[in-house]
């Protein structure tokens, strides 16, 4: 009779021992960056990192300088903190750094989607065609129509729309942007009321998933939470299924073109459903939170609100509703609103905190701007965290923690693009969308929908904080590195539709 308990116990001890030994054996080689493995075998600094990534990196930067390698859960990450040294990493002309490998593992875990060879190229090709330039006009019009539907209702404003209403600003922004974005990308039926109800249900489930997302990525969920994540994944796959899409019209060409490529490659419908879930997350996970910060900053800075409204009146004229049922805005006018552009760029500088990751494909040399050369080890992950190293650098952005609506404007009122560090012009003065091969392919659509929503709110609505003295809330530290930050608590505000002739 085989005693499986002792056998499995010995096997487990052997595996854990091997993993710990691997961490203990790693030593810094000549010319490699400073190595900080932490005090816990294999785990290294993982728990401290996950608790508050920003504070951890500040500490490591102060201890080791502009480049260092840390152990996080058995994996070694080399962080480069000098933005003047980002160029070779982001250009990577010889393709010695791989973004796709890490991304494919992440989307499989989070969305259940198993990437096909060429997916990254396919997504960028479709995005270039439909989310930039002339191809973006169709989607922008759909977004305006759906913002009208979500914000004004299927029959236009109700008789009491001009009465004050109260809500949480974060929920309000996230809810509206998500529903309008979802309907613009995945289409509608003939029943607008039902479309809104379904979009509302999808958003409620999306928020449940969203709240667990950081701990899900780090595998820190409890047993019941793992079950809940599995349930939510199945629900999204069903609600976004290609089968259900047959009942809808107005699905964006961006989505239909990519699904057509997947079908031609023989991808099963069930996997296409998971692809749709991934696209929903990629397109809607950050826009709502970003507009929350934008409107909050405008509400806390009356001079900024005044400047945006004056620009809107100058460019668009008086705000009006078409047939009293939808917003009448020429979306192309957004291209002539540098003050609004600066507000959004400043909001992204303060609120967007993604981590850029590249897998080191082979041992190689990284030359820093200082001239110092460091050896990178095959299998390690090279990481950039621009929020700390760029957005919060007082040399690049004086008073970096302060919201300045005109930070990205020249004295003449045009867009400011010249920023400097140590007297040298810096190309990457903000990086909210990532950069290089991993730059967000949908950034132009995302920026348009955010600007459009903010514009509609400040021109068609009166809005004010319930408590004018309420401070800007601190961010939720668990979300560092995952795109746009979210507040640690809600902010209450009031709004009402302005009467129009």
UniProtKB/Swiss-Prot annotation:
Keywords: Endoplasmic reticulum, Heme, Iron, Lipid biosynthesis, Lipid metabolism, Membrane, Metal-binding, Microsome, Monooxygenase, Oxidoreductase, Phosphoprotein, Steroid biosynthesis, Transmembrane, Transmembrane helix. Pfam families: p450. GO terms for cellular component: endoplasmic reticulum membrane. One of its GO terms (biological process) is bile acid biosynthetic process. SUPFAM superfamilies: Cytochrome P450 (SSF48264). GO terms for molecular function: heme binding; iron ion binding; sterol 12-alpha-hydroxylase activity. It catalyses: 7alpha-hydroxycholest-4-en-3-one + reduced [NADPH--hemoprotein reductase] + O2 = 7alpha,12alpha-dihydroxycholest-4-en-3-one + oxidized [NADPH--hemoprotein reductase] + H2O + H(+); 5beta-cholestane-3alpha,7alpha-diol + reduced [NADPH--hemoprotein reductase] + O2 = 5beta-cholestane-3alpha,7alpha,12alpha-triol + oxidized [NADPH--hemoprotein reductase] + H2O + H(+); chenodeoxycholate + reduced [NADPH--hemoprotein reductase] + O2 = cholate + oxidized [NADPH--hemoprotein reductase] + H2O + H(+). It comes from the Eukaryota. The modification Phosphoserine is found at residue 326. The chain crosses the membrane at residues 1-21. It is an enzyme of class 1 (oxidoreductase). The keyword Metal-binding applies. Its cofactor is heme. InterPro entries: Cyt_P450, Cyt_P450_CYP7A1-type, Cyt_P450_E_grp-IV, Cyt_P450_sf, Cytochrome_CYP8B1. It is found in: Endoplasmic reticulum membrane; Microsome membrane. Heme binds at residue 440. It is a single-pass membrane protein. Pathway: Lipid metabolism; bile acid biosynthesis. Its EC number is 1.14.14.139. Belongs to the cytochrome P450 family. A cytochrome P450 monooxygenase involved in primary bile acid biosynthesis. Catalyzes the 12alpha-hydroxylation of 7alpha-hydroxy-4-cholesten-3-one, an intermediate metabolite in cholic acid biosynthesis. Controls biliary balance of cholic acid and chenodeoxycholic acid, ultimately regulating the intestinal absorption of dietary lipids. Mechanistically, uses molecular oxygen inserting one oxygen atom into a substrate, and reducing the second into a water molecule, with two electrons provided by NADPH via cytochrome P450 reductase (CPR; NADPH--hemoprotein reductase). PANTHER family: 7-ALPHA-HYDROXYCHOLEST-4-EN-3-ONE 12-ALPHA-HYDROXYLASE, PTHR24306. This is 5-beta-cholestane-3-alpha,7-alpha-diol 12-alpha-hydroxylase. It comes from Sus scrofa (Pig). The lineage of its organism: Eukaryota, Metazoa, Chordata, Craniata, Vertebrata. The gene is CYP8B1.
